[in-house]
Amino acid sequence: MTFRIPSSQESSNKSEKDTTVNSPNASSFSSFFKKSSQTYLSKRSEKLNEHNSKLKSSGSFTSNSQTDLSNSPSSKKKNIFYPIARAKHSFYFNHNWSSDLQQANSPVASYSSQSVSNDSNFPKDVTSPISTDLSGSNPSLKSPSSINSAKLRASRSFFRFPKWSRKSWNPDVNSTTSSPSEVGSLDKAGGPLNQQNENLSAESDNTILQNGTRKSSVKMSDLGKRIASLPVVKRPPIQFSISSDYIKPVDKSDQTSNVPSPSSSVGSLRLYRSPSIPNDVEQPQPQSSRSRPRSSTIPTQRTLERLRENRSSIFSFRTLRRDDDECVAQTIENSALFSDIKPNPTKFLSSVPELTADDTAESYLSKLRETVPYSRMIPVLAEKDHVTLNKALHLCMSGMEFENRPLDFCLRLFLLKSHLPKETQQIDRVINAFSKRYFECNPGMFSSQDQCYILVFSLMMLHTDVFNSNNKHKMTKQEFINLCDIDELAPEIMEYYYDNITFTPFVNLDDELLLIEKEKNEKYNFTSRKRLGLSPYTFTLENQLNISRPEISLSYDGKFISPGIKDIASLLNVRKLISSPAIIQLVSKRSHPMAFSNHFIGLPDNADPGLVDFSISMLGILPRCEKKRRSVGHNSYKEHLVLLTASRILFFRNLVWAKDLMAQKKAYERRYKNFTTTSSSFDTLQGIDTEAMEYEFPKIPPLVFTPPLEEFSPDTSYSLVNAFAYCDRDKKNVRNCSFTVIFRDGSEETLCAPTEESMIEWVAKINYISTLRTAGLRMPVSDSYHPKRDFSCYPKYMEEELAAIEAQMKQDMEIARARTIKTRIDQLETSITEFNKKLMVLQRNAKNLSTCAPLQPKTRVVILQALKKVDAKAQSLYLEIRKMESQLQVLRFESDLDKCISLESSNDIDDRPSSTSPSTLKNPSINSINRQTHDVEKESSDRDVPHLLDPDNNFNLKGNPENPSSTFFTPEILSPKVYSDNVKDEPVEDIFGFEDTSESSPGKPSQLRLQIEAFDDELADTASLGSVTTCLDQWQTFSDDTDSGFALNLYSSEDFRTDPYKEHDEFSMNSLSKWHSATSDN
């Protein structure tokens, strides 16, 4: 309680006023507040007395003074009294207030006019009625001066809070709201004050207040006693409370009445004591607030509006929203998704039909549709675990279309049309039926129906966890990802589901339509209801899911093809082309093989250096793609000379030397363009007995490029081990007839062929060489390329023994080759199965990610990044599978072809004469294989061979499949015309070197030439191979023998004897030449 000393003018013009003293009958404040009130009043009294004594001594304080202490500078400086500033935070109860305080709307009591004597700062007779909110007994004050000299502030009073934030001190009583005019201050006492009598009259003692107490006028000396003598009543445990429910306004017009009026001014409210109100007085009834319903999975629409108040969408849905009067009902009328339901299905049309023994799932569902709304059908069908009800539930779910829709959107659509049952087992049946239907509509998104069920159940639990207000600990995104660690699903998919589910709660159509109908009857409209803003449902109802989906297509069917080898006939053609390569001669200065021949006389250093043959399976000048870092999306092409060897692919930038090689190749092809491998054409051109010369001379000599090279250093070189060449049909920014080669280190090279036939030949040869090199098999070499064994230095009785040894070696190598092919085929089949499983997992993740429709920008970025990663992994796996399928197909054709050759060879051996001289050993004719081609193809078709090429693809090598030997060379168009006029036709006899003895003749190969194969490291030490002079490993020193005095060592080391098919890359260059020389003579 607070007191203020009025001025003398106020005492003369204003009358004495009374205020009611509402003594609380229950103690609601603690003893701490009582003690603090006494201490506060005593200190204020001492300060005022000290200040007034100073003013009195200076003569400025008299009885006629009109100075207001509250406005004096000294009082403000010493923080004695700040009524305006403190009224903003708490309420004061004073005797009187100035006009400026009343304009500030301070809830204070009326001023009391009294005179101040010169002898004392306080009058002897003062009426100080006090209006307080104390609910306990007031403490006894020490002196009346302490009451007049201080001003009590209601610390931590509930009046400091606005009406909307006030809470009852008793949690068992519901507080009601009141208008702003009802809040703020205490009520005036009834009846006007006596303005003539300065002393309080005894007539006011008989005035009865509304709450049953008397309005008393006492002197200041008796005020403390009266307050201390107030009765103390215990507060009832439930009903008593000091709250805003018991603050009532007082009518200003009728001051004699104690009936509250809502038209009272601010600062005139009365505080009642709730336990002591008489029965004849109407007690305000508190408004009962609606109790919060039980937490459910689908909240009310009001909750949705509060949750969506400050939430923004990624697209703001400007293109999807219509006018301000849009509602869900309008969208439903224009949507085909709700054609099976009626608007506002709020009540059952009749009772639920009973399930009889004669009812089937279809009949019971039809009866249920006639009596029960669609939204209530799902709880009825899931009520019991019955076979017919379960079938009817799945039949009801079958009417929903979930194709190519995200799982979270389908779940929202289902719950928008249907209600969930209350029990857990019933909810489980509904989720099971929903997951089964979604799995049927999207078969490639999940590995099983159980996986889909687990994900749907997790989304339902996540929604309940997030939007349940009673749950204090919400699940975080990382916790959801860790808990829902479903096998084979990417974590980005779980992150997407978390963001979309927590974006907005689920909505049911019945609740939405009822809310719309209710708001039509309301007198006010919420501004937030002008636009619904249900972003996921707007997407679903208007079928606009493609707006938020990432535009990335992951389809590889028919995209990568590797043409050229589709049957045994095409494989045979590629094999013949590779077995007759061109030759580049390299000069080896470290070896002088002629010095060790029988015809050389002189020092070894004076002998001519040796020459090493470097086989070239294919060559050409091809534009090579060079990617630039600065220019994105634009690739430049530069011409390079490309050489394809038996183990590597080489790139040269020296186009001058490249044009020289291409000119020699063109002249060679023009010279022998009319030659074939058939004996009839050979007989016509030569007129020679081919029976005697069939295996003595080559039918077509190899192409030997001149002059020999002293240096051979390519600009770029790649190993063909585990390489793969393919054509990308959908690749952008590439030229026509282009193909790509992927090497084992992951690097790629894109080349452009001049024609489509040339492109097919390049792809077929690269894949064939890569298959053999990866499996560790020898490259096929024509018999004309094998150096001929000279038996003139051996005795005649040793010829049969050497021929028998050679035949046994050939048979052993054929067995080892067949065993190696079979082992490699088994490895490829196992690898293809494993890689297919990994590819299926990536395809499921890619389909899930491409179906997602994120609602937030951050989620969309995550989905795009995840799609790019999955795309890169899937493309790499797909190319790896295509490469293994290509190798598997080549090896199977190779195995079948070897069986045909072995069978033909055995037939030739049976017809062979008893003499086993090397001149009578025959190799199987290629033409004889054509008789068994039909049987081999039939046998290979029975096997489950992976389909490598596109069915519509007719790519094949140039030639007749019926007679693959009819075409031996494929002419190259890309060749310079500068050298064509200088080449002259030579006679036929010069082809085989009968008359021409010049050493530079391309048709006369060197007698010291050695056929070698290029391995990974052959370019590092190529010249060392020139020391080998024969087809055997090496000639050992002849030692004395008891019989003949000669001995021949056919094996150079024990390693070759035990394992002649050791991995080639592990050999050094010295052992490489030995291995090839020992195994090349078949």
Swiss-Prot record:
Residue ranges of every copy of the PH domain listed in the record: 193-349
Matching entries from CDD domains are given as: PH (cd00821)
Q: Where is the SEC7 domain?
A: 1-84
Q: Does the keyword Transport apply?
A: yes
The GO terms this record gives for MF are:
guanyl-nucleotide exchange factor activity; lipid binding
- Composition-biased stretches, type Low complexity, lie in 27-37, 105-121, 134-149, 257-268, 283-301
Which GO terms of type biological process are on file?
Answer: exocytosis; intracellular protein transport; regulation of ARF protein signal transduction
Source organism, top-level taxon: Eukaryota
One Pfam annotation reads Sec7
Alphabetically ordered keywords of this record: Protein transport, Transport
Q: Where is this region: Disordered?
A: 1-77, 103-149, 165-220, 249-301, 904-969
GO CC term (a single one) = cell tip
Q: Please list the residue ranges that the record marks as compositionally biased, kind Basic and acidic residues.
A: 43-53, 932-950
List, as start-end ranges, the regions of compositional bias called Polar residues: 1-12, 55-74, 167-182, 193-219, 914-931, 953-969
tRNA processing among keywords: no
Stated role: May play a role in protein transport.
PANTHER family given in the database record: ARF GUANINE NUCLEOTIDE EXCHANGE FACTOR SYT1, GUANYL-NUCLEOTIDE EXCHANGE FACTOR
What is the name of the protein in this document?
Protein transport protein sec73
Annotated gene: sec73
